[in-house]
A protein has these predicted regions:
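Bacterial Sec-dependent N-terminal signal peptides
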Residues: 1-26, 241, 403-404
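Start-of-domain marker
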Residues: 20-86
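Structural motif corresponding to the intra-repeat A-B loop/turn of tetratricopeptide repeats
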Residues: 31, 67, 144, 192, ...
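Flexible helix-coil transition and linker loops at the boundaries of alpha-helical arrays
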Residues: 43-54, 100-127, 159-176, 207-208, ...
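Structural register within alpha-helical repeat arrays
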Residues: 60, 67, 130, 137, ...
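Short coil/linker segments at helix-helix boundaries
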Residues: 65-148, 152-179, 329-365
């Protein structure tokens, strides 16, 4: 009885294998209709008997390439309209299937089942030839707001360089576009909040000489998150960005904020002075002025802010506002001191005169900032309210109504 059951089992297995083989044969017979062929071969990709045959994956990739070629041709025909979703999806599937074919084929070569690979060269040539078209797919998806597909296409472009079939392709590895499109993969990953992908592609993309700053910014955002962030990595990335892209204000601003928060103003001044030695931009001057302000070196800070004003470039309104701060905030220290004194205390009146004197100095600078940037109330609004309250109640009432 056992022998009979065993024989039946063998017959059933043989029939099942035969059925899967016939699926592959059917798919081959439909190669002139690639979409039908692609659908027909799908069961063979999951069945252990046929899924372990590199030819199955080669055929699946060929069908996807044929679908891609048909859609791509429409782009070049007068009045032709291609289905771009189908176009790029078939390209991505072709990549997946050819790479799987190579993986299985190489395993059989290493085990001795095959003497040498049959499909590697042809697959590699196809992948390399069509590789740039992945960028088109990524750009198309990104512009549509489909960041998942954008990440898929840009990621494939970058990842394929490290596939075993390209292990000896030094030209491909040296392609500067790898880092460029790793930047775009990073941007897409950042939009998806896919931290792992940001870190993976960001560390490649940061090496691009022109666009690498984008990858570093995304890395900084990822490491700077309150939950799951890494403050040490954040600082490392910000420092790297400052060194590699000193003209990008994002990194300079962040590193200076860090120095101020940590009480490391001297370190910040040393770094900003190095940057100013190479390029005296309004932003670098502004940062230096703020650092001097933080050290309470108000006269030196005012001199720097006046330089920004005399250059008449960017940040002029901000410079006027910061000069106002150099008088307003020292006055606030005296205001706090007076709050602890009795009104009949001789020191109280002396302090009141000092407060008014400092407010009088600050007033024209805040008013100039208001004139230059009336919509940016953070530069002048509350400061002028405080000053007018002390110096001129009519102006206070008018400004209070204006501010709402």
């Amino acid at each position: 009885m056992r022998k009979v059951l065993f024989t039946v089992a063998l017959l059933l297995t043989a029939c099942f294998v035969s059925a899967q083989v016939s699926v592959v044969k059917e798919a081959k017979s439909l190669k002139s209709k690639p979409e039908e062929a692609a659908k027909a071969i799908e069961p063979a990709l999951t069945n252990p008997e046929t899924a372990n045959d590199p030819e199955t994956w080669k055929l699946a990739g060929d069908f996807q390439k044929a679908i891609y070629d048909e859609e791509n041709m429409k782009l070049y025909l007068p009045g032709g309209q291609a289905d771009t979703t189908k176009l790029y999806n078939s390209l991505a599937k072709m990549y997946d299937f050819y790479l799987k074919c190579d993986e299985i084929e190489q395993a059989k070569v290493q085990s001795g089942e095959l003497k040498k690979p049959k499909f590697r060269k042809k697959n590699a040539d196809a992948l390399k030839t069509l590789r740039l078209n992945l960028v088109n797919g990524g750009g198309d998806a990104y512009n549509k707001g489909d960041y998942a597909d954008a990440l898929k296409y840009f990621g494939l472009f970058v990842d394929v360089v490290n596939e075993p079939m390209f292990a000896d392709d030094d030209e491909l590895k040296a392609d500067t576009l790898n880092a460029l499109y790793a930047c775009y993969a990073t941007l897409a990953a950042n939009m998806l909040k896919d931290n792992q992908a940001v870190i993976k592609y960001g560390n490649i993309g940061k090496n691009h000489k022109e666009e690498g700053y984008r990858a570093l910014m995304c890395l900084a955002e990822t490491y700077g998150q309150k939950e799951g962030g890494d403050s040490a990595k954040w600082l490392e990335v910000i420092k790297e960005g400052t060194e590699l892209f000193p003209k990008q204000e994002y990194f300079v601003g962040n590193i200076m904020d860090y120095y101020i928060q940590k009480g490391m103003v001297d370190e910040g001044l040393a770094q900003i002075n190095k940057l100013l030695a190479t390029s005296e931009t309004p932003y670098y001057l502004y940062v230096k002025g703020i650092l001097l302000y933080e050290k309470k070196q108000y006269d030196d800070a005012v001199a720097i802010f006046n330089k920004i004003i005399s250059n008449n470039g960017d940040l002029v309104a901000e410079a006027y506002s910061k000069i106002g701060d150099c008088y307003f905030f020292p006055a606030q220290i005296i205001v706090e001191e007076n709050a602890k004194l009795a009104i009949d205390d001789p020191k109280y009146n002396e302090n009141e005169n000092k407060i008014k004197e400092l407010y009088e100095k600050a007033k024209p600078y805040y008013e100039k900032a208001k004139e230059l940037k009336p919509d940016n109330k953070a530069l002048w609004g509350n400061y002028l309210l405080n000053i007018y309250w002390k110096l001129n109640r009519a102006e206070y009432d008018s400004l209070e109504k204006e501010l709402g």
